[in-house]
Amino acid sequence: MKFYDRLLKIKKLSPFCHSFHGLRFSFSECLPCVSRSGLLSLLWVGALVGGVFLTGCREELKDLQAKTSVEKCSESVQFESVESDYFSIGKLCGVDVAVVRSVVGKDTLVHKYVMMDSAAAALGTDLQRRGFPEDWLSAVVLRVPLNRVAALSTSQVGYMLRLGLRDNIVGVSDGQYIVDSILYERAQKNTVASIGYDAGALEKLMALNLDLVLDFTTGGDYDNYEQIARTNLPLMLTSEWQENTPLAKLEWIKLYGILFGIRAQADSIYRQEKEKYETLKALIASTDSLSSLVSRHSSEHCPRVLAGMSYGGVWHASGGKSFTANLVRDAGGCYVWASDTSRELTFSFEEVYALADSVDMWVNPSAFGTVDEILSLEPRVKNIKAFRDKLVFQNDGLKGPGAGNDFYEGAITRPAELLWNLTKCIKGSVPRVNSIDTSYKWYRNIYNF
C-alpha cells in the first residue's frame, strides 16, 4: 500500500482524532486498516498527525479559556442620573444595561435589559459565566445595534423617527394611526406590517424576523405582552406615556440611542431640547412675575385651566402631578387641581360644575374635537365659563393621513415647541426663543377649526 493511500485510510478514520481532547489515542482502531508491513509508516504518520492535533487542541483550549475567563464584575450598577421615573440606564460588567418599570394598577412591572454590541457578545452572552450579579441573571440580552423592530405604540415610532430610524421599523400596531406620511404609506402597502390585536398578531410578529418588539401595557383588554413573551421574541415594555413631565418623556430617547448604537446623537437631541425648554420656561415665569408686580394681582396673570371630560356624569381628569398639569404650569397657567398628587382624578359633574364660573380655559376635552361632539355628550358644559368664552383647546391640531394624532408621535420629542404652542393658547403671547420652531401647532381652539 502506498504511503498516500495509507494517509487516506487514516483520514477516513478521523473520528478517533477527536479523542485528543481527552489526550487519548487508540492505535488498535487503526491496525485493521493497514498491513503489518505498513505499521511503521502508520506509526510515523500517527505521531505527525497526533502532534498536529495536540497542538490544535491546545490552541483551541487556550481560545476556550480566553472566552470563559472573564473577570468577575462589580455587583453594583453604575446608573446615570435621569429625570425619568420609569427607566434607568447605566453600566454593568462593561456593557450598557437598563431597568424599565411599568405601573399597572397597584402593581409595578420591572424588566431588566443587557445590551451587548458584537465585541461584548464575543465574550459570551451567558450572564452567569460573565460574572453578572444574581439579580441580573434573568435579564433580557439584546444584541445591539438593533436592525429590525416592531414599534407597537406611536410614541415609540416618534422617538425612532426623530433619530432617523424609519427604515428600522418593520411593524406597527395599526398603520392608520401613523402620522409620518412615508411610514403610513408603507403600512398601507404592507411593506411595514400592521400587527393589530387579533389572534393573528403573534403570527405576524414571529414572521418578521425581529431583533426586538417594543410594546407597552395599560392593564387593559388589548394587552398582549404576556403572549408575546411566551413566543421567546425579544420584548421591551416602554412606559414613556406614564411620565409626568415633558422632559422626562423626552429622555427616553437616550434608551433608543443605546438600542440602535447612536447614543451620542440621542444625547445631543436631548440636551438641545432640554435647553430650549428650560429657557422658554424661565422666560415665561419671569414675564409672569414682572406682570404680577405691576398689577399686584397675580391671579390675573395665571389663567385657571380645566382639563378632561364627563362620561355618564363622571368627570375624568389628569391629577395635579400629571404630564398635563406640569405642562400647564410651565406654560403659565394654574391647573384647577394642581394641589392633588394623584395621577388621575374622577369627580361628579356637579363637583366640576361648581368651578364653572372660575375656569378661564379648558384643555384636552377627551377625544372630542368639535363643539357639537362635546355638547351631544354633555349639554351642561355650555355653562362653563371657558366654554362660553370659546376658549376650549384640543391637542389634535396636527394629524396624519389617516386617524393619527401627532401629539402622541412627534410632540414627545419636541417639548419646547409644545410648551410654546400651549403658552400661546393660554397667555396669548409668548417670549421669543430663536431656536424654537413655532410652526408646530398641536393645540388648537375647537371654535376655530
What are these regions (language model features)?
Residues 107-108, 118, 181, 268, ...:
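Coil residues (strongly favoring Ser/Thr
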Residues 58-60:
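Bacterial signal peptide processing site
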Residues 243-272, 364-449:
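Structured C-terminal subdomain patch of bacterial secreted/periplasmic proteins
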Residues 282-283, 301-378:
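Flexible, glycine-rich surface segments
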Residues 96, 102-207, 212-219:
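A short, structured surface patch at a secondary-structure boundary
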Residues 53-56:
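C-terminal motif of bacterial Sec signal peptides marking the signal peptidase cleavage site
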Residues 148-163, 265-331:
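Basic- and aromatic-lined ligand-binding clefts that recognize polyanionic substrates
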Residues 17, 30-33:
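Cysteine-centered motifs
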